């Protein structure tokens, strides 16, 4: 399975609460890497966020880091692509409850074998969800994380992101939904904003950023 298919899915009161819970009030968080803007680069083409190095750290490490048990799943898209994910329903980072989704870098043959051994299949709005065997769940936890999606529980004003991340290299608006993607290729980061929705931050290794951006460019337009 290609990396592209795996990789592919004034401050208001709430924004002030986000800042307060994350950094400014009442003081520094216990861990600086609890913050979504604390991005490290162990190497030029790698990224480390929330204490996890994408492309190296595995799902087991994420469970230890977040002190929560993940929910592993296998998804089949309408065009037949298989994607392995683990989902954290609620993690507490810098005092802010959030959801985290990890896409797992599993070889295509392994994904197909897991699919064939699946216990149950349910139809979702975006394809099919396969319940994995206990053995495959344990195996899934040993493969590297290819992308991390962070979903904070509060709506956040754009000014917060500008202050913490700076100006994006590009802004791309989806034609169909109107959502706007702020792109930071040097950090492998795509921040999705718009329509009054809560933000979504997706991190990938910078070397794979083109694979994330390509579908956006095909289905959207670059804003001036």
Model-predicted regions and their roles:
Residues 6-26:
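Hydrophobic membrane-insertion alpha-helices, especially the h-region
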Residues 25-34, 59-224:
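A cross-family detector of function-defining hotspots
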Residues 39-50, 136-146:
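Acidic/histidine-rich, surface-exposed loop or edge segments in extracytoplasmic proteins
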Residues 49-52, 151:
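Short, flexible active-site loop motifs that bind/organize anionic cofactors or intermediates
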Residues 55-56:
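Glycine-centered tight-turn and secondary-structure capping sites
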């Amino acid at each position: 399975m290609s990396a592209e298919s795996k990789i592919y899915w004034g401050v208001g009161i709430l924004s002030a609460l986000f800042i307060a819970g994350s950094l400014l009030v009442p003081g520094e968080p216990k861990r600086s890497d609890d913050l979504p803007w604390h991005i490290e680069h162990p190497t030029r083409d790698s990224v480390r966020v929330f204490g996890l190095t994408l492309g190296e750290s595995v799902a087991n490490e994420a469970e230890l880091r977040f002190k929560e048990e993940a929910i592993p799943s296998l998804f089949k898209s309408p065009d037949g692509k298989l994607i392995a994910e683990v989902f954290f329903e609620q993690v507490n980072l810098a005092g802010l409850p959030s959801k985290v989704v990890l896409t797992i870098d599993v070889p295509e043959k392994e994904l197909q074998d897991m699919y064939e051994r699946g216990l149950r299949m349910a139809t979702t709005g975006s394809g099919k969800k396969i319940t994995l065997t206990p053995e495959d769940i344990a195996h899934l936890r040993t493969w590297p994380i290819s992308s991390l999606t962070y979903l904070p529980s509060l709506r956040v004003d754009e000014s917060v992101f500008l202050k913490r991340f700076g100006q994006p290299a590009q802004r791309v608006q989806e034609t169909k939904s109107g959502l706007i993607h702020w792109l930071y290729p040097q950090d492998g980061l795509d921040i999705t904003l718009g329509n009054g929705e809560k933000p979504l931050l997706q991190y990938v290794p910078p070397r794979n950023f083109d694979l994330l951006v390509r579908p956006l460019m095909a289905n959207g337009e670059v804003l001036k």
